[in-house]
Each structure stands twice: as structure tokens, then as C-alpha cells.
Curated annotation (Swiss-Prot):
Pfam families: Trm112p (PF03966). PANTHER family: PROTEIN PREY, MITOCHONDRIAL, ZGC:162634. Belongs to the UPF0434 family. InterPro entries: Trm112-like. GO terms for cellular component: cytosol. It comes from Bartonella quintana (strain Toulouse) (Rochalimaea quintana). HAMAP family: UPF0434. This is UPF0434 protein BQ10150.
Length: 65
């Protein structure tokens, strides 16, 4: 699990280069710019577009960085 805020600041979306937000509940890193959610498995962020899921229309910017 990514608990260090500085670690999160270093990670960027591989598609847009934009910032990511952590969703602790779903264990995902969210790129609102790309509208993708990257999974975190066993504490490791999987930053591959092929592994990301598209965000649903009802998923809003409620997650904190």
C-alpha cells in the first residue's frame, strides 16, 4: 500500500503524465485526466494502460492525493 505522500507525488499517469489520486477503498491509483484507474496489487502499483480500468461516469473527484 502506498502510504507515503511523497511516493504518490512521484508517480504519474503513464498516458497523460498527470497526477494520480489514491483510492484506498478500491486499492487503485486514479487518473482523472485519462479517466483510468490503475490497480495496486500486493502493495505494487501496476502502471500499465492494459491493466487499467476505465472510470465510470458516476466516479467523481472524491479521492485525495
Amino acid at each position: 500500500m502506498i502510504t507515503d505522500p511523497k511516493m504518490l507525488e512521484l508517480l504519474v499517469c503513464p498516458i497523460t503524465g498527470g497526477t494520480l489520486s489514491l483510492n484506498r477503498k478500491t486499492q487503485e491509483l486514479i487518473s482523472f485526466k485519462a479517466k483510468l484507474a490503475y490497480p495496486i496489487r500486493d502493495g505494487v502499483p501496476i502502471m500499465l494502460a492494459s491493466e487499467a480500468r476505465p472510470l465510470q461516469h458516476n466516479e467523481k473527484r472524491v479521492h485525495k492525493k
